[in-house]
Amino acid sequence: MDIPIIKLLVEKDSISKKYYCPDCGELLINNFNPEKFKALQCKNGHTKCLQCWEQHLKLRKNCLQCKVPVSSIKDLSLNLYIAQKISANKVYCKNRYYETKNFTIDEENGCKEIIRVDEYEKHIKECPLTYTDCKNYDDFIRANPQIDEKLLKRCGKINKSLLDEHDEQCLYQTITCEHCNELINRIDHEIHLSEWCSDIPIKCEDCKHVFKKKYIQEHKESNCPESVIDCVYVAGGCQKKLKRYNMSKHLVTANHHSQYMSKIIEEQNQDIKELHNFIENHLSKKFIDLDTIVNIQKYLIKNKNQKISQLTEIIKRVDNSFIGLHEFDELEDYISNTIDIISNFDNYKNSNSNNNNNNKNTNENENTNENTNENENIDIVGNSDNENNINENKAENNINSFIKEQIELIKIKSQQFDINSVIEEIRKNYNVEPYQVNGDNAMITSPNKTDVDNLVFDDDEDDFDLEEPQIVGEFIFNKSQETIAIPTLIRQQQQQQQQQQQQQQQQQQQPPPTPLPPQNTTITNDIQMENINENINNNINENNNNNNKNNDDDNITAATATNNSNTTSTHTILNGTNNEASMTDINETTSTTTTAETTEATASESTEESNNTAETTTTTTTTTTTITTAAETVNSTETITLRTSEKVEEKGKDGLETTESFSILNSTENSTISSLKVLSNSMIEPEITTDKENETNIKESIETKIIESIVESSSPTKSLLKQGKEQEQKNQNGNGNENENENENENENENENENENENANANVNEKENEKENSNINTSNDTEPTNDILEDIKKNKENEDSNESEDNKNNNIKSVEDTNNNNNNNNNNNNNNNNNNNNNNNNNNNNNNNENVYDIKKDRNRENVEDSNDNNSKNENGKINDNGDVKMGSEDKVNDDDDKMAMVDRSNTIFRNQILFKDFTKLNARHGVGVSIKHNHTIGKYKFYSELFINGETENEKDYLSFYLNKCKKENESIIISFGIELLNVDPKKSIRVYWDNELLNNSSQVMYNYGYGETTVIKKSILEDPNNGFLVDNCFIVNLEVYKIIDVPHPPPAHLLQKSSPPAATTTTTTSSSSSKTTPKTKR
């Protein structure tokens, strides 16, 4: 229908020019399509073809000739006259032409009819000579899309009258095979017969019979009589070839076939045996592999069950401690109530202070009516009461300031409390990655999901593929879709309060352990040491001048506290602007610790014992003090390390070990309260001594006070110790009141006191001898004092030799008078002291069983490594019946290691299973000294393990070596207990190695080793043999377990440790009391 009419007109010249378009020159109607068969004109009769009108109206809305407005085609009218004239013309049928592009005429098969233009459409529908495309070609292309059309030849246009003839010859026509009746295309017929058709008849080349193609091969191999074949016994050695129909004759005539038959039978029997052996070996290996797989699966199932049980327990604990948003209001009420209770402490304090003042006034009024001797005693007690009142007020002020600070902190926390801070605090405490919070339920979930049982490590990389769940405290935090509830803050506060109460009780019952020396310490100059000696001499001279006046006041400052094991005393003193002010402060705040011999004695002996306690003081320790003298106005930041002898390792006959430490404590607000309670328990009671003893006691007190002033001036715990002394003075005030009441009854008991004084004077010589013996014994049991104390004693002896006999006699008389008045008090005080001594003995016996970390012990262990040999490894690395290997770090270090408790391996805080795949590949790739590293994170600590397949050095190249190292972090040291387990198919044969209480350190100041492990875990020959059960499918598994981690304060530099520690502390071997062993080379 798209063919132009002008192309098919029979008489083109007969049409007038008025039927052509004036714009394009074509016929006004030039299309057979009925919709386009029309000529359009404007109102004035100007006619154009349809295409010209459409193009013109796009540009202008008017007629091109008369300019009449024309908005669209609808405004134009049809010119029916022109349509009738054009439709009356004659045209040819389009089927006259073979193709309409060039209008090539098909004179043989083309349509010869001539028709009118208006009849053309009807004729085309009925014309029998229409040309079409070949359908067979289209069907062939659809059935074989893989064939490229460019390689094929199309059939072209075909006249409808010739379609039948074309199908008989068309190559793409579908036909049926005459042999197998299979449908094929005519173009594939020849290939089908030659290669594909199985039913095509083929003649046998030997017998000339015809068989189908699918049977011809079988015919030749088994049935064809003319085929040439080998003898049946060709395997036995017969090389005869003949036609099949002659084979029977050959078998009958030949006699050597029996030999061939026997040979064939033997070969077959041998083949059968080999096959049988192969099957047995293969099945045995399969059974062994199955057993190993089953045992490993059982072991993994057991571990899963343990993990499931742990998770169930944790879920129960978490459910019990779940908190919702509705409990936050209760928490705010709780905080407000605590604030009110603490704020009411001021009223209670004021009421108590008023009562104390009233009691003191009444006591003073009553004392004015006593006799002259009593008045003197009352004046002494009154002066001590005034001093105690001052100290009490200072202590109360310190407590009030502390309480106010706590109130402000609680108010700030209550104002800033919200759910986000609670979640953030829990995340920091348990070292958990950020989690998502789901709305009002306040539940924490993690976004990631991992499978712990599929834990596999890559031998080429340091990092592992999946993370093992980490056990931190009571919770397991794993990157999996598990829900963890938030514990209530109220329950946490209750637990913290209980822990603080337990710590306070322990501190009251036993002395705190000696803290480690501070990190930054330096040695003072000789000028400072000379200043100390000058101050000592000046203070001694001043006291000699005021000796007769202030004997009683100076002797009050001595307090006794006995310990059978370790006695630690902390001395503090405030510096004044001049010597007199400093001496008054010394008399107010001094607290010295003395050790008295506790022996069976009567009441009279106890009085003499109290008089001589100042002489029997033996304080021998490793002291660390900060020097600042009273005369200096500038505070010195340098510190002095007092040189002492080696640590006490041998106990005396009485089992006494005394230790005094001028220590710098690091304490928090909680520790300040507990320390105040501990110091308040030690009651300061006045003691009256003889005149000679009084002078020596005064000198010793002055010496200790000067050392205390050195400590107090720059110690970071100055305020803490000052509060403790003020609390002691407050407690002493109560004792002074008791002494007043006792003095009122002295007149009634005058005769009894005289008798007791006579007995006491009779036993003076015996008591002095006993005290000299006790001094000798205690000096043997303890360490010798430092150089400064030795110089002080020398000065004291010189002063004693210069004293006159007159002063001694006067002092003796004054002491006798005071003894007559205070015998009853001394008896009571000594009885109390004996009870305190017994309590201290019990506490110290308990303290001996506790574990105390000693940094010198770890330094000894580090130096052991270089002196050990392979024999010591084998001794310490023995395997127990349970497969455990206990390493040398658990051997005792002298007698102090009896205090080290064995770690409880049931409380494992971290377990990680490492799978090492393809052992042969690892063995070939990692040579001597080349390790496989894996990172591990346990809470806030980061470690990495190292496995040396071929040993760390040439000496251990035949062994497997394993180490656990701490990732480098400055100024951080820990004590760790851990173990490894090399899994075996038989769990009883698994190798377990563990290390207890090992020090891991990464400091740039101190050259400590940073890893622990074992150089000879297992021989490679044992591991490489798969029959031993360690290798399964060329893989082995190592379990890493961590039992505890303890933070350790950072040690001082090595050059100070060498000066402060005794020479005997640098031994390179460690021995135990039961057996002598050397520590193996387990640390690098």
From Swiss-Prot:
Record has Repeat as a keyword: yes
Entry-linked InterPro entries: MATH/TRAF_dom, Mucin_signaling_protection, TRAF-like, Znf_RING/FYVE/PHD, Znf_TRAF
Subcellular location: Cytoplasm
Comp. bias regions, Acidic residues: 739-757
Pfam families associated with the record: MATH_2 (PF22486), zf-TRAF (PF02176)
Keywords: Coiled coil, Cytoplasm, LIM domain, Metal-binding, Repeat, Zinc, Zinc-finger
Zn finger residue spans: TRAF-type: 122-190, 191-248
Chain spans, region Disordered: 348-392, 490-523, 537-656, 709-897, 1056-1084
Biased amino acid composition, Polar residues: 571-586, 774-785
UniProt feature, compositional bias: Basic and acidic residues: 644-656, 790-799, 853-864, 875-892
Domain spans labelled MATH: 909-1042
Biased composition (Low complexity): 349-375, 492-509, 537-549, 556-570, 587-637, 809-849, 1059-1084
Coiled coil: 265-321, 489-553, 735-852
Domain LIM zinc-binding: 19-103
The organism's place on the tree of life at top rank: Eukaryota
GO molecular function: zinc ion binding
GO cellular component: cytoplasm
Domain remark text: The MATH/TRAF domain binds to receptor cytoplasmic domains.
The family this protein is said to belong to: Belongs to the TNF receptor-associated factor family.
Role of this protein: Probable adapter protein and signal transducer that links members of the tumor necrosis factor receptor family to different signaling pathways by association with the receptor cytoplasmic domain and kinases.
Name this polypeptide is given: TNF receptor-associated factor family protein DDB_G0272098
Organism taxonomic ancestry: Eukaryota, Amoebozoa, Evosea, Eumycetozoa, Dictyostelia
